[in-house]
């Protein structure tokens, strides 16, 4: 039996069971012909029933679609003359009554009970008029009240940080809101947009309410808006009047409404009219000398029927993107330098950006090649470009509220040109996996006033990975390496060499795939976050050991030191240990 036949059979069995039950119930009559076809949700079957709501009889049509019983029936008010949209919660423009949330699970094993429950829920919605639901789900109702033209506000900074006057910039169908033009410009440019060519700047009036608005209070005209603002504070209405009379520019109004779960946002757009220069408003006075109170009163009378455009308002700021309104400022204020944008480094950089680190600098001198594609965050479209620059573009476009810089050079050459190259960073990450580079970086970390450094590297086949955090206390990288950069506390012992040589070339590489790589990248990123949020007072090393059952397939075994530390029953283990000074280390033992 193929999938379509199986799903169709379950649907038909549920429908037959439902039809049999309703045939014996005189309260229901089957929908046929035009009545059923009038619904645009591809109806398969339907029934009508009449219910009594506050002394009035209302016919409900209960419509079954091809996804029943996985999805509940759709219930509509049949009389299109009864308009309860924005009067009763959960009633849509077309008369559909939303009885069960889209995300709610239903038990498909009981189709008749699901049908009756849905009808009972619809009656309850119509009877009780649960006003609180309008407040709890304000953004949904505000969005549906907008009509056909639906522009959106993108608020690029936390609403709590905005004063009563902010900046609004039109960028296509979006209106970008921020504390200043500069903050909006930076977000837009990080998102790949140039405001000079696409935008018009104006003012944004930020209005705060102690609770969300009910639909009956949604303003349609400037007169409605002034009345609403007066009820919320006389100074807010006066501020609106000043904006309207000031110029012909765009005026955006951002509603910030307090709820138990945070601020609910809504937007309104209108346009200033430059009424301070309207001669008719100056009757009896010299132009420009009308008392402000009288000017505003005359302006209000002229503008009271001016229409408003409602808009959704979306938060796109750091706090919301990364923590949904929770903490996050600590990470946003952090600055990290990552050296090495190869396979491991690219995923580490991506994770650090997703974690919300506010400023990231990427350093790598190499170009993206075809042989990198299979296990690198970047892909075919980036071939021939700088790994650091392509990664910067990828992260910056995905997370425009962050600041990402690329330095496509050998980090040592770059560092020699700067007086204090790493002084502005809270932490440095090295995933370059080249002993000549990492030994130099370790020297700087031990010899200078230097931020903490996290060194990340993989063992063969990425069956083990390490993240060594070097701070002022404890050991350094060389405390665990021999003179040739070989790790002396490795997890795996392999009889044969694991480096592979490229055909006809001089380059070597390690065999491993993305499935083993990504957990190791997570290990390194977590070490970075732990060091930033601390305290990590002394050096430590985090080690990830993957599926030990794969060791024999690779011709390897655990080192004797690690055999004693690991639980052979676990398929993946992380062990964090203090990294102490090696008495023979030439840097730490001085």
Which sequence ranges carry the predicted segments?
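A structured beta-alpha segment of the ubiquitous adenosine-cofactor-binding alpha/beta core
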Residues: 392-426, 432-434
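Glycine-rich phosphate/adenylate-binding loop
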Residues: 133, 144-300, 423-427, 431-590
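Domain-scale recognition of soluble eukaryotic interaction modules
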Residues: 2, 72, 79-171
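Glycine-rich adenosine-cofactor-binding loop
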Residues: 324-367
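A short acidic, amphipathic alpha-helical/loop segment
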Residues: 351, 417-418, 439-444
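Compact alpha/beta protein-protein interaction domains typified by the UBC
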Residues: 33-102, 112-113
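Glycine-rich phosphate-binding loop and adjoining beta1-alpha1-beta2 segment
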Residues: 365-401
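N-terminal charged helix/coil linker that caps or initiates catalytic domains
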Residues: 274-336
